[in-house]
């Protein structure tokens, strides 16, 4: 089984959290709402990987002004690729609290949509299991 270390930002701006609706045909949680993030590359520090993933997935204009390590955990997930193949992966999550100075997001093909969601609205979305656990552990759900 392959192992991946995943950096995961909890991005907040003026009391709202950035969530991404995953593409319906790929990923670990197809079609569900999730935090952004992705795998570390060899030679990267945690923060370098986090900032790269934010740029790749959410665009160059989202200005992250603060990054603070928050938690880590692991689990085993099945990832679905765009061609329909699947793979079981041991995932190690490094989760960070992040503040953004703006909401200027340009998302890539990994996502169907993005939303800035208040704490009160988190429970109205179809959050994936990992994101729901994260927000529950933070006391937001």
Curated annotation (Swiss-Prot):
One Pfam family cited in the UniProt record for this chain: NUDIX
Catalytic reaction(s) noted: a ribonucleoside 5'-triphosphate + H2O = a ribonucleoside 5'-phosphate + diphosphate + H(+); a 2'-deoxyribonucleoside 5'-triphosphate + H2O = a 2'-deoxyribonucleoside 5'-phosphate + diphosphate + H(+); dUTP + H2O = dUMP + diphosphate + H(+); dTTP + H2O = dTMP + diphosphate + H(+)
Enzyme class of the recorded protein, top EC level: hydrolase
Tagged with keyword S-adenosyl-L-methionine: no
Enzyme Commission number(s) from the entry: 3.6.1.9, 3.6.1.12, 3.6.1.-, 3.6.1.23
Residues annotated as domain Nudix hydrolase: 1-141
InterPro entries reported in the protein's UniProt record: Nucleoside_triphosphatase_NudI, Nudix_hydrolase, NUDIX_hydrolase-like_dom_sf, NUDIX_hydrolase_CS, NUDIX_hydrolase_dom
Subunit structure: Monomer.
Database matches in HAMAP family: Nudix_NudI (MF_01846)
NCBIfam families in alphabetical order: PRK15472.1
Protein name per UniProt: Nucleoside triphosphatase NudI
Gene, per the UniProt record: nudI
């Amino acid at each position: 089984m392959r192992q991946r270390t995943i950096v995961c930002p909890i991005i907040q701006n003026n009391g709202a959290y950035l969530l991404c609706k995953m593409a319906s045909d790929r990923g670990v949680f197809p079609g569900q709402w999730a935090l952004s993030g992705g795998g570390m590359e060899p030679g990267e520090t945690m923060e370098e990987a986090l900032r790269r993933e934010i740029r790749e997935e959410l665009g160059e204009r989202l200005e992250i002004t603060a990054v603070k390590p928050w938690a880590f955990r692991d689990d085993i997930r099945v990832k679905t690729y765009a061609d329909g193949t699947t793979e079981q992966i041991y995932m190690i999550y490094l989760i960070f609290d992040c503040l953004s100075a703006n909401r200027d997001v340009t998302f890539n093909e990994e996502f169907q949509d993005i939303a800035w969601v208040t704490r009160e609205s988190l429970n109205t979305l179809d959050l994936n299991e990992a994101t729901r656990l994260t927000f529950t552990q933070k006391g937001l759900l």
